[in-house]
């Protein structure tokens, strides 16, 4: 036989080069990990959450080492065993001659090759395992829910805490056995234990025993998988009923099939071992056994359940699936905390504006006119003071008690926007040591405007820029520490270096302007808070120079022995870092608590393995018009359990993070608290009263619950199966074709059935594929506990939904003409939140109308208010303010006569009188007029000319005066024309303005 030439070896230089490159890569990788770990340790120590850092780090290291080592031992051990069991003599054949070359290459360093393979496999297994730290901690620290699943009677805690980690371990075991089997088969083949050519046995006895044992272990693991699959079935989607959880075919066909397959797997595993080694000693019967398992899996686990589903369930699915739909309804409502929802019928039968609108003190006066998204520009322009200050794309809504009266306010913090620094201002020194913080919380009542449509600011003033009467004379929401070092506008690279070299040094941080205009005086400041990591030593400066890849940490004189580094300055990111087990709400909001500006962030505990509960995508369910335009987008996380378990606060000055327990009955939170020592989260009893007064129903939780309730408000299995009573969330009223969902909105108001006005998050829903109103939802806190309420309208209601109401109001001919007057080439009309307010056994709709000039530096001003009562289109007004609009609505109701009620279901409703909306501008050309009527017409013409001139000038104060003059002139003309006269002044502006 011709000897095989050995394969060529790599040159010494090549080996050295590869070794150096690998060494450099490993060195830099370890250096990066080390720097990140060290700086994280310093940061966690400063915020006093080292138990989180150490707990997560130790857990990840243990999982990495344990699973990685186990995988390496299993794979490497089987490689070694396969080589150890190699035959000493191999028959001569062309196949063996070819393999001899590989044996000659591998044999000198076979141990090294096995070690490399084992290390690589173990490394990947360890890296995968360390990412499962959260599953392990819940597995170790989880308890009972106190609720059992409806099929097996097992506590829900098993599914939430134990099952995910058992499934992961099973996956690791499968991977280890498969890799060991592949590796052992390869070694046996290379060293002659397995042959593809030649006569006699193709496999040595030792190789057969080894490989059959691995196959038997694989089949036994399959038996374990079938047992776990019986539990996992309660989490899977039921196509027959369009819900999650095992259905009729699953329980009556697939469930027993899984049990049978588990027993078959055990028998097959024994057969593989026996037939391969103790009896017959060939692969025929083991192969038949494995084929039997495959056929059984297809027939028993596939065809039989399919036949039951197709021929028994589908013809009568409504009845067959009813029991399992009911399970899903109950589990979903429990998992999403909907069990305590208060549902009340609301007839909304009054279709005419009642006189009580004019005397109401709970709903109408509290109607919010300021839209927190639109007036953000207004806040920025009027309260910015310097070009680098910013209020963000959306403001927040909170409530305060000022002078004994509680109402909602639109609030925002004046933050540094590093993107608006000029080229000179944005060098490293200025960006990180001078422009370090914002200043002040600015607030305005949500139901009041002044000075031509501006908010009435009551706090957060800087300089003397406010006009007389356009803002409160004194700060009504004072903050003793108004500086904002931590805010929503802060990004990853926006760190600040604070602290001066000695007490006599001049302050270096820009604090605030103290005079008017861009040329006014400026005051400077030195940070004195407890936050920030000390970086005075050379080692710390070197450490952070490497972390931030910035040499100025070492070279700049701005960094001194007293310097501190403030980083991770976004409140939401700080909470996510100290509590990585929480899902954080996308809309943090600021409040003045004990004189300090404090960020309040809602934290959620979630799970994805609650049996029979509906599974949703968190990102999809929380995305609406405001996502990424003032609210943060959630991750694409699939969940079927959520609780608002934590209220977190971040001090805007020193960055202190505090976690408060809010849902003391949540077993998931208890498990996490136990995992980190038991005192990570403060008790609910420790929440300060002043802080709890500013808690609000979380937006993302409300959106999830609202969307789940669109289906799961139906509690009858039969009705649920038909799907006819499902609801949907309407699109944005003024842009329905955008496909964006209408966001919920915060209001301080009183719904029917509530004893007094309260701060609540509200939303309207419509029937599926229809646009009339189906229900109103509200979320609020009553005595510190969350309360979700639903006002459900009759199915045959004539009340329009938000999209219809907006279209009916804006398409009204006379209102359309007035809106056209407001918009032109020089300005555009913008609509605020369309508020749906149940009142007087009917529906009141309020929609503020803003006008924004097309000129530079322009901002929206509230100019008009659209109001509608009843069905949404019969009683409509466009007024200068809310009080005037309510007055006009009441007058329309009085003219229409006695209130009407809808006829019983099935009867044809009588026609409802449709009063003409009160006009504010003329629309029809009259016959010639003389005398007093002619004088009035001339006044109207002059007012129209002035209105056009004001539009073109972009002067909103002048524009407001012109509108008022036009309204007065029109009223005088109508009075001169006499009752019933159809005469209107000539020269009306065209719809285009």
UniProtKB/Swiss-Prot annotation:
Q: Where in the cell is it found?
A: Cell membrane
GO terms under cellular component: extracellular region; plasma membrane
InterPro entries recorded: UPF0182
Query: Which residue ranges have biased composition labelled Pro residues?
Result: 900-929
Which keywords does UniProt give here?
Cell membrane, Membrane, Transmembrane, Transmembrane helix
Membrane protein topology class: Multi-pass membrane protein
What superkingdom does the record give?
Answer: Bacteria
Q: Where is the composition biased (Low complexity)?
A: 976-993
According to the record, the segments passing through the membrane are: 18-38, 61-81, 110-130, 171-191, 209-229, 260-280, 283-303
Chain residue ranges for the region called Disordered: 892-937, 974-993
Q: Return the PANTHER family for the record.
A: UPF0182 PROTEIN SLL1060 (PTHR39344:SF1)
Q: Which family does it belong to?
A: Belongs to the UPF0182 family.
What protein am I looking at?
UPF0182 protein Sare_4110
Source organism per entry reads Salinispora arenicola (strain CNS-205)
What are the leading ranks of the lineage? Answer: Bacteria, Bacillati, Actinomycetota, Actinomycetes, Micromonosporales
């Amino acid at each position: 036989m011709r000897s095989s030439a050995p394969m060529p070896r790599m040159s010494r230089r090549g080996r050295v080069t590869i070794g150096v490159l690998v060494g450099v890569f490993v060195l830099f990788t370890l250096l990066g990990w080390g720097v990140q770990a060290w700086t994280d340790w310093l940061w966690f120590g400063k915020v006093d959450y080292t138990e989180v850092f150490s707990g997560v780090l130790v857990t990840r290291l243990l999982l990495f080492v344990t699973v990685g080592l186990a995988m390496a031992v299993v794979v490497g051990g089987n490689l070694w065993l396969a080589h150890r069991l190699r035959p000493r003599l191999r028959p001569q054949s062309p196949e063996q001659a070819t393999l001899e070359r590989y044996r000659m290459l591998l044999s000198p360093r076979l141990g090294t090759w096995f070690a490399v393979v084992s290390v690589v496999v173990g490394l990947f297994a360890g890296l995968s395992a360390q990412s499962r730290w959260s599953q392990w901690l819940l597995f170790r620290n989880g308890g009972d829910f106190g609720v059992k699943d409806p099929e097996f009677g097992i506590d829900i805690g098993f599914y939430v805490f134990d099952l995910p980690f058992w499934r992961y371990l099973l996956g690791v075991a499968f991977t280890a056995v498969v890799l060991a089997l592949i590796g052992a088969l390869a070694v046996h083949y290379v060293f002659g234990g397995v042959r593809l050519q030649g006569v006699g046995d193709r496999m040595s006895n030792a190789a057969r025993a080894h490989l059959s044992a691995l196959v038997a272990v694989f089949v036994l693991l399959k038996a374990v998988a079938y047992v776990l699959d019986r539990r996992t079935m309660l989490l899977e989607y039921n196509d027959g009923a369009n819900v999650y959880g095992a259905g009729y075919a699953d329980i009556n066909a697939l469930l027993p099939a899984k049990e049978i397959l588990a027993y078959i797997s055990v028998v097959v595993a024994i057969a593989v071992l026996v037939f391969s080694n103790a009896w017959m000693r060939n692969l025929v019967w083991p192969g038949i056994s494995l084929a039997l398992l495959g056929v059984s899996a297809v027939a028993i686990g596939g065809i039989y359940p399919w036949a039951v589903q197709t021929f028994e369930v589908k013809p009568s699915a409504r009845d067959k699936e009813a029991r399992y739909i009911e399970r899903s309804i109950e589990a979903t409502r429990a998992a999403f905390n909907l069990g305590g929802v208060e549902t009340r019928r609301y007839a909304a039968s009054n279709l005419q504006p009642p006189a009580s609108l004019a005397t109401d003190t709970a709903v109408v006066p509290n109607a919010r006119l300021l839209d927190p998204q639109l007036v953000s520009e207004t806040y920025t322009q009027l309260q910015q003071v310097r070009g680098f200050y910013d209020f963000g794309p959306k403001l927040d809504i909170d409530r305060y008690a000022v002078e004994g009266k509680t109402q909602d306010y639109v609030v925002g913090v004046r933050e540094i926007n590093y993107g608006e620094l000029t080229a000179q201002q944005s060098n490293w020194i200025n960006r990180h040591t001078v422009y370090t913080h914002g200043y002040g919380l600015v607030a305005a009542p949500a139901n009041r405007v002044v000075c031509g449509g501006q908010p009435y600011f009551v706090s957060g003033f800087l300089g003397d820029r406010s006009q007389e009467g356009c803002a409160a004379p004194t700060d009504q929401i004072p903050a003793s520490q108004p500086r904002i070092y931590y805010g929503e506008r802060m990004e990853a690279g926006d760190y600040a270096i604070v602290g001066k070299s000695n007490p006599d040094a001049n302050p270096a941080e820009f604090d605030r302007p103290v005079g008017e205009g861009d040329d006014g005086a400026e005051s400077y400041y030195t940070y004195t808070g407890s936050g920030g990591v000390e970086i005075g030593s050379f080692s710390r400066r070197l450490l952070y120079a490497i972390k931030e890849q910035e040499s100025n940490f070492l070279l700049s004189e701005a960094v001194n022995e007293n310097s501190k580094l403030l980083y991770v300055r976004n409140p939401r990111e700080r909470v996510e870092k100290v509590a990585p087990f929480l899902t954080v709400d996308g809309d943090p909001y600021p409040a003045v608590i004990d004189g300090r500006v404090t960020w309040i962030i809602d934290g959620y505990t979630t799970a994805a393995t609650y049996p029979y509960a509906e599974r949703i995508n968190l990102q999809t369910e929380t995305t609406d018009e405001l996502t990424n335009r003032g609210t943060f987008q959630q991750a694409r996380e699939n969940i079927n359990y959520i609780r608002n378990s934590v209220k977190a606060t971040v001090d805007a000055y020193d960055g202190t993070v505090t976690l408060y327990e809010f849902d003391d009955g949540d077993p998931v939170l208890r498990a996490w608290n136990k995992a980190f020592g038991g005192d990570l989260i403060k008790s609910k009893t420790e929440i300060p009263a002043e802080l709890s007064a500013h808690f609000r129903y979380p937006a993302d939780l409300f959106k999830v619950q609202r969307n789940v309730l669109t289906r799961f408000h139906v509690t009858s299995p039969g009705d649920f199966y038909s799907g006819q009573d499902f609801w949907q969330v309407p699109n944005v009223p003024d842009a329905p074709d955008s496909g964006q969902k209408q966001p919920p909105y915060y209001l301080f108001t009183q719904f029917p059935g509530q004893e007094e006005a309260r701060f609540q998050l509200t939303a309207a829903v419509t029937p599926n594929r229809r646009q009339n109103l189906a229900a109103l939802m509200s979320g609020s806190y009553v005595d510190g506990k969350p309360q979700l309420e639903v006002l459900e309208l009759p199915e045959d209601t004539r009340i329009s939904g938000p999209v219809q109401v907006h279209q009916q109001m804006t398409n009204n001919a006379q209102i359309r003409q007035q809106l056209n007057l407001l918009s032109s080439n020089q300005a555009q009309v913008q609509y605020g939140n369309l508020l749906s307010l149940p009142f007087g056994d009917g529906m009141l709709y309020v929609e503020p109308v803003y006008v924004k000039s097309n000129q530079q530096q322009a901002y929206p001003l509230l100019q008009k208010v659209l109001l509608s009562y009843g069905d949404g289109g019969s009683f409509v007004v466009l007024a200068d303010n809310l009080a005037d609009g309510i007055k006009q609505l009441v007058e329309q109701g009085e003219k229409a006569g006695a209130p009407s009620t809808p006829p019983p279901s099935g009867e044809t409703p009588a026609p409802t009188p449709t009063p003409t909306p009160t006009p504010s501008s003329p629309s029809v050309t009259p016959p010639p007029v003389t005398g007093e009527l002619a004088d009035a017409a001339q006044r109207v013409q002059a007012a129209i000319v002035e209105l056009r001139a004001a539009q073109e000038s972009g002067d909103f104060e002048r524009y407001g005066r012109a509108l008022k003059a036009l309204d007065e002139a029109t009223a005088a003309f109508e009075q001169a024309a006499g009752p019933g006269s159809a005469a209107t002044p000539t020269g009306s502006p065209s719809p285009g303005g």
